[in-house]
């Protein structure tokens, strides 16, 4: 490759102005377009969707993004009265709405239930009575028609009328003298009845023991969008702080998807700033002490920055949008880019001649770039935007960095930088490198034993597809969730499922009815512990309602209605109640009923309705049902429940599990493709199968060794760290290529200096990466923490194999004449 880069160097050396113009112009162009790039912060949108169900689970469904507001007593020994908790919740919700007048982050808050709702709902229910009456309930109704049952109920009716001060009780008795409400809708309309783990008192929502007041906030954005969520979370947290300061006896707890998303993002940012920031400071100090000139530091940083800007511009030209997580993951790939710069700088540090440096280094650097790019480009064969973005950005970063290092960087190298120290080199590093890593039988024997153990154990490494395990468990959010589960979840885990149709509400209602029948069978089989019947009782398709209306007409014959009227008048007379009091009820029995739509009637408050039904902007209709199950049977339950037609679980990570496993399988295939590509490039470059295999050795073996020791230490692959393992592949190729170039120079010409120069550069490259990755071990976020541990294991195996096993195998093969002849190595 020096035949390409040397003429370029000489041309720009004689035309410095043109070189500076090209450098500045390209930097400005790349920087301008790189700044236009948009970032996707929602990790879920970066995963592949293989079906409509998956796509729907990832859509902006308001219920899964709902925020839970809880107000309880700060002093649990002296609890606040429920009435005070309810008032406090109203005040807090009013404060939130006032704070949101300009930002419009809140779509709505459901904090109380209108006391008139029961009468409105009863009026609608009686106007469409047959539609809500399951045929299985006619047996109970028939029992209510006996004279004894009527007399017993009439006594209760009389007591209600006697104690009625507003007239509402009398109206209720007139509309429903048989108390059919207890048969039909008692579990829904009675304010004292628990509904989905909640109770109502004076219109306020409470947990069953009334020690916690509840409210539900619906964000005006996707809960997994941590960008928009950050402003919303800050706004709510400020309101909580102000409200608690004004009400010292009150404790406010908040939990929901937006808070979890923002908490994870903030934790990642803090971890990266602290760990990488401190590690880079340490690296800066070491580099200045080693090179004795600050210019060497910026000469390492600028090419990497140029490559990053070049990559951002390319991403904008190709896609226009990029995964923010892929950008964060790509930061560690910059370690490979620094490695190329180190080889240029350290080689120049020793030889003091830019042309000789290019003659010696252009081929291994370019070859290392090509093979590493091949490893990253293999990610383009996956179905995940996250992996593709990572592969593209890493590829363009390395290309931009390599071009800068070989075209522009040599013009900024001057002999005065190394005049004071050139002949002394790096004594401590050289002493370390001079240790007999490849000649000591104990070192080789121990390494071979460790390699065998790693390879044997490698099949036992596991892959964790559950993205929920990558969440950071914030203390405040954990407290809020724990309180909610303790007070409302009856000891079981709860999750919402949705029956849906693309556009037809009636079809969605039919799917929902079928779904509830499926849930009923699962409950009888003991697979689930229970489910909320609300959506099944309230929402019925026109066809289903018409069938129920026909059954109603068949039950209420003229003879039965006449007998009921006679019995009601007689029973009412015993309490001196008017004989015409129940005329409106008798009229209901004779009414010519038509199917109705309780949603379009608007009698259910929007905040309450959102717990059971949602119509999306694209016309899709969804009906929600809360299902209770034993936590340890989660996977079994989720799969069993979603076997129903047109039903999804409102947990995107459920679908992520299967898709992340697909990504894992894609990744394994990608590694094989990348390996074959790298081996072919090495074979084409060295033109000798034995040399290509030796150069390929560290990358190939280190992958299995890393997996083996992950299994030994109980570490598992996940979506994040498996991507980073590509980096281990890439750096392993680079190190082996540079060592191989040095070994060949030593074997052919007897020049040991080339190998020494390369090993010094490898040492500094490995040191930089080791410091950065070791710092990640101290991160609080589990995803970042796992990256640090796995990268350390991979780096250690790569360095040991490159330093010892690769030279050992090469020197053993050099003892054979066929090997020396095949690669023009002279006889000893």
Segments predicted by a language model, with ranges:
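Hydrophobic transmembrane alpha-helices and their membrane-interface caps
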Residues: 296-343, 691-739, 804-805
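Signature of alpha-helical transmembrane segments and their immediate interfacial
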Residues: 1-41, 410-411, 415, 419-466, ...
């Amino acid at each position: 490759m020096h035949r390409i880069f040397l003429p370029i160097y000489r041309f720009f050396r004689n035309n410095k102005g043109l070189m500076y113009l090209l450098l500045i112009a390209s930097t400005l162009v790349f920087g301008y377009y790189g700044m236009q790039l948009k970032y996707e912060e929602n990790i879920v949108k970066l995963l592949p969707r293989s079906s409509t169900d998956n796509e729907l689970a990832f859509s902006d469904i308001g219920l899964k993004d709902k925020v839970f507001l809880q107000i309880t007593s700060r002093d649990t020994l002296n609890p606040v009265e429920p009435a005070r908790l309810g008032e406090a919740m109203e005040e807090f919700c009013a404060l939130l709405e006032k704070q949101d007048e300009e930002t419009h982050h809140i779509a709505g808050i459901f904090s109380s239930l209108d006391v008139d709702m029961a009468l409105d709902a009863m009026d609608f229910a009686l106007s469409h009575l047959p539609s809500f009456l399951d045929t299985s309930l006619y047996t109970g109704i028939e029992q209510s028609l006996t004279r004894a049952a009527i007399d017993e109920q009439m006594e209760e009716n009389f007591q209600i009328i006697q104690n009625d001060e507003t007239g509402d009780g009398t109206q209720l008795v007139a509309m429903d003298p048989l108390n059919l409400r207890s048969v039909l809708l008692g579990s829904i309309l009675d304010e004292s009845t628990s509904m989905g783990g909640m109770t109502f008192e004076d219109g306020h929502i409470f947990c069953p023991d009334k020690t916690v007041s509840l409210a539900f906030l619906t964000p005006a954005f996707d809960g997994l969008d941590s960008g928009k969520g950050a402003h919303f979370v800050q706004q709510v947290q400020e309101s909580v702080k102000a409200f608690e300061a004004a009400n010292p006896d009150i404790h406010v707890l908040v939990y929901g998807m937006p808070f979890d998303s923002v908490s994870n993002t903030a934790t990642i940012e803090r971890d990266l700033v602290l760990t990488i920031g401190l590690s880079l400071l340490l690296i800066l100090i070491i580099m200045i002490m080693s090179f004795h000139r600050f210019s060497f530091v910026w000469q390492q940083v600028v090419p990497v920055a140029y490559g990053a800007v070049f990559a951002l511009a390319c991403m904008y030209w190709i896609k226009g949008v990029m995964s923010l997580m892929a950008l964060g993951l790509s930061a560690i790939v910059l370690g490979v880019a620094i490695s190329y710069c180190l080889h240029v700088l350290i080689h120049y540090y020793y030889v003091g001649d830019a042309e000789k440096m290019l003659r010696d280094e252009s081929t291994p650097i370019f070859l290392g770039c090509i093979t590493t790019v091949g490893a990253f480009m293999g990610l383009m064969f996956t179905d995940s935007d996250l992996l593709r973005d990572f592969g593209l950005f890493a590829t363009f970063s390395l290309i931009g960095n390599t071009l800068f290092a070989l075209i522009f960087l040599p013009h900024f190298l001057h002999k005065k930088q190394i005049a004071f120290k050139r002949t002394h080199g790096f004594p401590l590093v050289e002493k370390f490198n001079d240790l007999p890593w490849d000649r000591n039988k104990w070192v080789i024997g121990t390494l071979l034993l460790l390699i065998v153990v790693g390879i044997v154990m490698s099949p036992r490494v596991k892959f964790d597809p559950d993205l929920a395990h990558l969440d950071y468990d914030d203390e405040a959010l954990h407290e809020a969730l724990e309180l909610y589960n303790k007070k409302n979840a009856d000891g079981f885990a709860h999750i919402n499922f949705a029956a849906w149709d693309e556009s037809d509400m009636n079809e969605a209602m039919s799917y929902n009815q079928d779904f509830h029948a499926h849930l009923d069978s699962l409950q009888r089989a003991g697979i689930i512990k229970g489910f909320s019947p609300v959506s099944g009782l309230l929402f019925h398709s026109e066809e289903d309602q018409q069938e129920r209306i026909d059954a109603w007409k068949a039950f209420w014959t003229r003879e039965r209605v006449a007998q009921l009227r006679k019995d009601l008048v007689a029973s009412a007379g015993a309490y001196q109640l008017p004989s015409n009091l129940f005329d409106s009820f008798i009229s209901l029995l004779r009414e010519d009923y038509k199917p109705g739509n309780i949603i379009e009637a608007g009698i259910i408050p929007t905040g309450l309705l959102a717990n059971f039904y949602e119509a999306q902007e694209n016309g899709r209709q969804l009906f929600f049902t809360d299902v209770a199950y034993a936590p340890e049977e989660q996977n079994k339950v989720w799969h069993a429940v979603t076997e129903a037609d047109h039903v999804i679980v409102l947990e995107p990570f459920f679908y992520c599990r299967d898709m992340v496993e697909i990504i894992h399988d894609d990744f394994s295939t990608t590694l094989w493709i990348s390996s074959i590509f790298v081996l072919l490039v090495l074979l084409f470059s060295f033109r000798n199968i034995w040399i290509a295999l030796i150069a390929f050795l560290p990358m190939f073996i280190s992958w299995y060794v890393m997996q083996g020791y992950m299994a030994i230490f109980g570490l598992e692959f996940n979506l994040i760290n498996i991507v980073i393992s590509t980096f281990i592949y890439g750096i392993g190729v680079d190190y082996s290529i540079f060592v191989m170039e040095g070994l060949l120079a030593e074997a052919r010409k007897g020049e040991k200096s080339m190998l020494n120069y390369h090993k010094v550069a490898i040492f500094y490259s490995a040191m930089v990466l080791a410091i950065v990755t070791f710092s990640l071990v101290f991160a609080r976020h589990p995803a970042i923490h796992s990256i640090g541990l796995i990268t350390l294991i991979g780096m250690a195996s790569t360095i040991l194999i490159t330093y010892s096993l690769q030279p050992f195998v090469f020197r053993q093969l050099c003892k054979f004449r066929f090997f020396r002849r095949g690669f023009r190595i002279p006889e000893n």
